[in-house]
């Protein structure tokens, strides 16, 4: 069963990585809009969830967010974070930069201690307006599942033009103002072995992470049902080993098992 995210506001939910998180979904609630089609995505495969409804407008997002924040200010709970996530890639919304401006202003008005986080697959960070918007949020969380482009094409299945070297270059441009998020898993997809926990994938990934020099690395594994049922969680030991390698090069790392 795939996860359903209402639009434009959902939750709050308890996030393994972020705490009490109020979700902001800039995609239609009846489908999925993403430049990736990850085989582990809790929202299912893109082809199974084509939306019929339009994207929420900037005005709809702002009004819904303010109403929810007013309710939370009165009735609780206090959010730790306002998180752009949901059913697809938030930076694909044509008014993403303006929505970030609105969100930061509303955060400052109602819950100034809350963080604003964006979970992004990094495919639009080459756009100047998107880059500038991501540079303003508290937690600019960018996906990099490996540094191996052939593997990314099997795991994340990006649409259109995709170059992992260009993505890494775009991440470097944040000059440390980013968090790298990486999914580690095992199992197969069709006849392909999708295990990325071995040194074959981990060591080149670690070199890329060193090159990007983020302020933090988040490593995690499958938590919910995936559209491909042959995938498996990475073990605690495997994640701990990878985390130790990250710490050895002097970077902060968090692990979600």
How should each PLM-predicted stretch be described?
Residues 2-17, 63, 70, 186-257:
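Auxiliary Fe-S-binding modules of radical SAM enzymes
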Residues 17-63:
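Canonical Radical SAM [4Fe-4S] cluster-binding loop centered on the CxxxCxxC motif
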Residues 21-23, 81, 141, 179:
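Short hydrophobic-acidic sequence motifs that mark active-site Asp/Glu residues
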Residues 24, 63-71, 99-106, 206:
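Short, well-ordered amphipathic alpha-helices
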Residues 31, 89-90:
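Short strand->helix junction
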Residues 45-81, 95-98:
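Conserved alpha-helical substructure of the radical SAM core
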Residues 83-89, 121:
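Glycine-rich beta-strand-to-loop/alpha-helix junction loops that act as flexible
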Residues 92-232:
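Conserved AdoMet/S-adenosylmethionine-binding subsite of the radical SAM
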């Amino acid at each position: 069963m795939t996860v359903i995210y209402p639009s434009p506001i959902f939750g709050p939910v308890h996030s393994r990585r972020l705490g009490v998180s109020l979700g902001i979904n800039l995609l239609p609630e009846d489908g999925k809009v993403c430049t990736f089609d990850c085989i582990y995505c809790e929202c299912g495969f893109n082809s199974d969830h084509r939306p019929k409804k339009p994207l929420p407008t900037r005005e709809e997002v702002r009004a819904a967010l303010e109403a929810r924040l007013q309710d939370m200010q009165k009735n609780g709970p206090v959010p730790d974070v306002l998180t752009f996530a949901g059913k697809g890639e938030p930076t694909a919304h044509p008014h993403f930069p303006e929505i970030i401006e609105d969100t930061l202003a509303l955060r400052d008005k109602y819950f100034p201690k809350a963080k604003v986080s964006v979970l992004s697959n990094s495919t639009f960070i080459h756009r100047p307006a998107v880059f500038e918007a991501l540079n303003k949020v508290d937690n600019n969380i960018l996906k990099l599942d490996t540094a191996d482009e052939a593997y990314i094409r099997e795991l994340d299945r990006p649409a259109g033009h995709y170059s992992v070297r260009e993505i890494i270059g775009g991440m470097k441009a944040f000059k440390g103002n980013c968090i790298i998020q990486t999914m580690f898993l095992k199992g197969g997809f069709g006849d392909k072995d999708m295990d990325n926990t071995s040194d074959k994938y981990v060591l080149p990934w670690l070199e890329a992470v060193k090159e990007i020099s983020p302020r933090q690395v988040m490593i995690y594994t499958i938590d919910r049902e995936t559209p491909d049922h042959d995938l498996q969680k990475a073990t605690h030991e495997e994640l701990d080993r990878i985390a130790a390698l990250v710490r050895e090069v002097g970077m902060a790392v968090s692990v979600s098992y």
